[in-house]
């Protein structure tokens, strides 16, 4: 399941993200963070970390450097 989600995220990075421009307020980007989370922790924990990161990605959060721990 993780590999399927990584493929979807990669498709997003290749085809959709360039159309939107650079909008992520974090480094690494949320999609790169997600791929790292799935590769490192697998499906369940990777999904949890991805959702937690996406919930922080809004205009009222300062963003910045937020690596995978």
Curated annotation (Swiss-Prot):
Keyword Membrane: yes
UniProt KW keywords: Cell membrane, Membrane
A UniProt-annotated Pfam family: YidD
Compartments, record wording: Cell membrane
Membrane topology, from the record: Peripheral membrane protein
The keyword Membrane is annotated on this UniProt entry: yes
InterPro entries: Membr_insert_effic_factor_YidD
Gene Ontology cellular-component terms listed: plasma membrane
Top-level lineage group: Bacteria
Major subcellular location class: membrane
Family stated for the protein in its record: Belongs to the UPF0161 family.
HAMAP family assigned to the protein according to its UniProt record, in alphabetical order: UPF0161_YidD
Protein task: Could be involved in insertion of integral membrane proteins into the membrane.
PANTHER family in alphabetical order: MEMBRANE PROTEIN INSERTION EFFICIENCY FACTOR-RELATED
Protein name in UniProt: Putative membrane protein insertion efficiency factor
Organism from which the protein derives: Alkaliphilus metalliredigens (strain QYMF)
Lineage, opening ranks: Bacteria, Bacillati, Bacillota, Clostridia, Peptostreptococcales
